[in-house]
Amino acid sequence: MVGEGCWPRRDTPLEAAIVVGLTCGLRPGELLALAWDDVDLDVGLLRVRRAVIRVRGKVELGMTKTASSRRELRLPAAAQDALRAHRQRQNEQRQQTGTYWQDHGLVFPTGVGTLLDPSNLRRSLLQATHKAGLGHWHPHELRHSAASLLSAAGVPLEEIADLLGHSSTWVTSSVYRHRTTPTVEAAAAPMDRLFGPPQDT
């Protein structure tokens, strides 16, 4: 189980990226392509519409991996809290950066507002997990861990497939045959139980 001492230092962009990646099961490219227009913190929804891709050695915004990867997710409370704090820090950073800031509306940009290269996310996560004694973690491990945690919490396979935007299994295909833009809500409650504040007993 990922505990308090395993997170990177509080009040850093990496912390928010890890929380969202782990609780929502996003692909690294989907995570880095998120724009604030894709996030509705008032109602707790996140829309996955794009992905960061590499074209001739450069990163740019592109399509998601598959049509089923374009999805709408209910944000667990831990992710909502992390994103609210992250947005406030980003606003402060934008003011400090001044005219050097390039406003593309990205949730997890570079220090000047541009697209973050996935290799930089991978390097930062590797440093954080090594420091926490967790060994070598690739950003995809957040996605895999989300699936494992939800499975252990008893979430049905079909709902996990919806959350992850899978399209390669028969079960996932049968779900998307009937609804092309699902709002995945069932996975949020188990993630809140796993990562939310302790419940009174």
Per-region residue spans from a language model:
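Basic, Lys/Arg- and aromatic-enriched nucleic-acid-binding interface segment
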Residues: 1-34, 41-42, 53, 68-69, ...
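Amphipathic, well-packed alpha-helical segments that form the structural scaffold of globular domains
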Residues: 3, 84-88, 122-130
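C-terminal secondary-structure termini that scaffold catalytic or DNA-interacting sites
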Residues: 8, 43, 52-79, 89-96, ...
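C-terminal catalytic core of tyrosine-transesterase DNA break-rejoin enzymes
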Residues: 12, 19, 23-30, 119-120, ...
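Conserved hydrophobic/aromatic pocket- or pore-lining residues that grip, position, or stack substrates
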Residues: 18-20, 31, 48, 75, ...
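Short functional hotspots where side chains directly engage DNA or cofactors
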Residues: 43-48, 138, 149-150, 161-179, ...
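Helix-coil-helix junctions within alpha-helical repeat/solenoid scaffolds
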Residues: 82-85, 92, 118
